[in-house]
Amino acid sequence: MKLPIYLDYSATTPVDPRVAEKMMQFLTMDGTFGNPASRSHRFGWQAEEAVDIARNQVADLIGADPREIVFTSGATESDNLAIKGAANFYQKKGKHIITSKTEHKAVLDTCRQLEREGFEVTYLAPQSNGIIDLKELEAAMRDDTILVSIMHVNNEIGVVQDIATIGEMCRARGIIYHVDATQSVGKLPIDLTQLKVDLMSFTGHKIYGPKGIGALYVRRKPRIRIEAQMHGGGHERGMRSGTLPVHQIVGMGEAYRIAKEEMASEMERLRGLRNRLWNGIKDIEEVYLNGDLEQGVPTILNVSFNYVEGESLIMALKDLAVSSGSACTSASLEPSYVLRALGMNDELAHSSIRFSLGRFTTEEEIDYTIELVRKSIGRLRDLSPLWEMFKQGVDLTTIEWAHH
């Protein structure tokens, strides 16, 4: 077993060796290096064929038509293109958008930008387990609502939203539904022939593909229109200009192909490992599970250890690559906005750790993690005056702390 142990698969994944090998064939003079938009020679035709194959592989995993797949630079761009693109195109119908407080920043900050441009956004607060109350969503829908954006799987706590029902609600009212599926693709079955989802964002690097490549699904029937955000040569049916990075697209295609083949057995294996991890630490005193094991994806376990500072715990666990919150916000010392939206107090939110498991996680690593966490929590609490007061029965919520 090699240290440190990587348990931050929700931040990014290593490229699968099979994917890397495939990508290498599309870089040098010996390989297929042409521009897929070059229509006048074989170098371009071969590159275009490789892109077509990858587009089919991506579409296959999610039950889409390959013509509904638009390649982008990643899920952040896909979220921007979907939300700004749809809002700009349909703004004559209305200027109201609904999303939730626990979305990824790529959705929240895009909505904030639209607010500056005159759109109105309703931010729904989830229930304490992270799931959106569909009655609240329904109550928020108005005649001028043009877009709902609610993610499939939350990147911090792993809870799964009921996107099928939300899709039905939106379709019945003629509202466009966008889903950020960054954390669910390759982990949960997605069938867009059945789901009434109009726009869906994906990435490559969360499922063992390369970074810097993603896709946006844009439904053809009924046809969804979006306004391009990147202008130029009119690539990707005019929705996203820019020379296609063939090696990255091929990598993403191969990653999606592998996911389709291995997803069912791999998720079963990871569910076992996640449960093993939780069973190994759940009897620690004052430990709280954030999210919902029943309605959660098997790759994420988010736990708060009361009376332990999250940052000091991460330092104590230096042999484990884990995070508190998401990578995108891990540079700030603010407690996780996702956990606070669940109604959690700052102290508990601050003491949270996200363990995310993946393809190369082993049972041995999980057992080592359990042992290390138990030891570290014990040691840090021994040093904590708050823990001592708690053990003596002091109600810490009643204490007036002096400001200095």
Curated annotation (Swiss-Prot):
The active site is at C328. Its EC number is 2.8.1.7. It is found in: Cytoplasm. GO terms for cellular component: L-cysteine desulfurase complex. The modification N6-(pyridoxal phosphate)lysine is found at K206. GO terms for biological process: [2Fe-2S] cluster assembly. [2Fe-2S] cluster binds at C328. Its cofactor is pyridoxal 5'-phosphate. Pathway: Cofactor biosynthesis; iron-sulfur cluster biosynthesis. InterPro entries: Aminotrans_V_dom, Aminotrans_V_PyrdxlP_BS, Cys_deSase_IscS, Cysteine_dSase, PyrdxlP-dep_Trfase, PyrdxlP-dep_Trfase_major, PyrdxlP-dep_Trfase_small. Pyridoxal 5'-phosphate binds at A75, T76, N155, Q183, T203, G204, H205, T243. One of its GO terms (molecular function) is metal ion binding. Keywords: 2Fe-2S, Cytoplasm, Iron, Iron-sulfur, Metal-binding, Pyridoxal phosphate, Transferase. It comes from the Bacteria. It catalyses: (sulfur carrier)-H + L-cysteine = (sulfur carrier)-SH + L-alanine. Homodimer. Forms a heterotetramer with IscU, interacts with other sulfur acceptors. Master enzyme that delivers sulfur to a number of partners involved in Fe-S cluster assembly, tRNA modification or cofactor biosynthesis. Catalyzes the removal of elemental sulfur atoms from cysteine to produce alanine. Functions as a sulfur delivery protein for Fe-S cluster synthesis onto IscU, an Fe-S scaffold assembly protein, as well as other S acceptor proteins. Belongs to the class-V pyridoxal-phosphate-dependent aminotransferase family. NifS/IscS subfamily. This is Cysteine desulfurase IscS. The lineage of its organism: Bacteria, Pseudomonadati, Pseudomonadota, Gammaproteobacteria, Enterobacterales. The gene is iscS.
